[in-house]
């Protein structure tokens, strides 16, 4: 019976969050506890079945996430796979990440949420989520509940054994998916090493491995992605992590696709956003969308930190 009444309570929370109204601190705490129980059973390479709709960075742009669900279909009617970066930069990180975690707890088989490089204690203290939690709750407890939960998020997902999804990119320390399965992910994102690379690396026009201008992860060339896909029986690496003006961008002779789902990123970049629908035969189509009509911005005094595009 307890499960049933919790589901009912969750439905009320989801309804409230859909109106961009935050939960109480104690509600967030119990939501995060429940989410840990679910995520702890998921793999570093979480298996996902098609049909599924794959999404890139959202970055606290709550009204644009609503637009994404309007275009792609509501959860749980549509299965979703989000590739990280739910928080920072946008004005509504709290409501955005709370809603996605609530949907995960309510419909664990219908939505997959991966870890991005912003799902980290260190990064969120610089790029907005920490300050937003302080402003909206008056203390850092909610920030702590979420950043503790972030350690449990799966690092990657595999759609029908063929399409490999993750936030950033490949790693010189990783040749096979089994290498990823063997990592201990229950920790803050390290400054270097395989787990860091999966969340920070970027594809590049130059071959081989390169030093990343981001100061973490690597750049990797087409030779690397072709070899990785071939060795692991993959048809595609799907990733996010980089702003692309059309919302999606193919590279490496279609071995890699970048998907970015925050339109007019940082409320000023003028980009479209996109999501990738995979049907039950793994045929893909991209849906592009523009920002939701702007409501008045919240009154925030903030220094906008420099950021990598």
Curated annotation (Swiss-Prot):
SMART domains, per database record: PP2Ac (SM00156)
Cofactor note: Binds 2 metal ions per subunit. Can be two manganese ions, or one iron ion and one zinc ion.
GO biological process, one term: mitotic cell cycle
Binding sites annotated in the UniProt record for Zn(2+): 57, 59, 85
Subunit field text: PP2A consists of a common heterodimeric core enzyme, composed of PPP2CA, a 36 kDa catalytic subunit (subunit C), and PPP2R1A, a 65 kDa constant regulatory subunit (PR65 or subunit A), that associates with a variety of regulatory subunits. Proteins that associate with the core dimer include three families of regulatory subunits B (the R2/B/PR55/B55, R3/B''/PR72/PR130/PR59 and R5/B'/B56 families), the 48 kDa variable regulatory subunit, viral proteins, and cell signaling molecules. May indirectly interact with SGOL1, most probably through regulatory B56 subunits.
Family: Belongs to the PPP phosphatase family. PP-1 subfamily.
Protein name: Serine/threonine-protein phosphatase 2A catalytic subunit alpha isoform
Organism for this UniProt entry: Gallus gallus
């Amino acid at each position: 019976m307890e499960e049933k009444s919790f589901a009912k309570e969750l439905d009320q929370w989801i309804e409230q969050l859909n109106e961009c109204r935050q939960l109480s601190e104690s509600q967030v705490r119990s939501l995060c506890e429940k989410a840990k129980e679910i995520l702890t059973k998921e793999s570093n390479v979480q298996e996902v079945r098609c049909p599924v709709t794959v999404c890139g960075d959202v970055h606290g742009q709550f009204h644009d996430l609503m637009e994404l669900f309007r275009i792609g279909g509501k959860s749980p009617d549509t299965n979703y796979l989000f590739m990280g970066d739910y928080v920072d930069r946008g004005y509504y990180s709290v409501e955005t990440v709370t809603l996605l975690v609530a949907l995960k707890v309510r419909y664990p088989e219908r939505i997959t949420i991966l870890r991005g490089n912003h799902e980290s204690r260190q990064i969120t203290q610089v790029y907005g989520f920490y300050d937003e939690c302080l402003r909206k709750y008056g203390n850092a407890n909610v920030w702590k509940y979420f950043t503790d939960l972030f350690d449990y998020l799966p690092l990657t997902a595999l759609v029908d054994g063929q399409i490999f999804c993750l936030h950033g990119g490949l790693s010189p320390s990783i040749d096979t998916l089994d290498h990823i399965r063997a990592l201990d992910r229950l920790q803050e994102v390290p400054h270097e090493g395989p787990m860091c690379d999966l969340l920070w690396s970027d594809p590049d026009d130059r071959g081989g491995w390169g030093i990343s201008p981001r100061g973490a992860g690597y750049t990797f060339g087409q030779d690397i992605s072709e070899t990785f896909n071939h060795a692991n029986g993959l048809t595609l690496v799907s990733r996010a992590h980089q702003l692309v003006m059309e919302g999606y961008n193919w590279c490496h002779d279609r071995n890699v696709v970048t998907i970015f789902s925050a339109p007019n990123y940082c409320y000023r970049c003028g980009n479209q956003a996109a999501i990738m629908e995979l049907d039950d035969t793994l045929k893909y189509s991209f849906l592009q969308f523009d920002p939701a009509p702007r409501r008045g911005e919240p009154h925030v005094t903030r220094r906008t930190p420099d950021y990598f595009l």
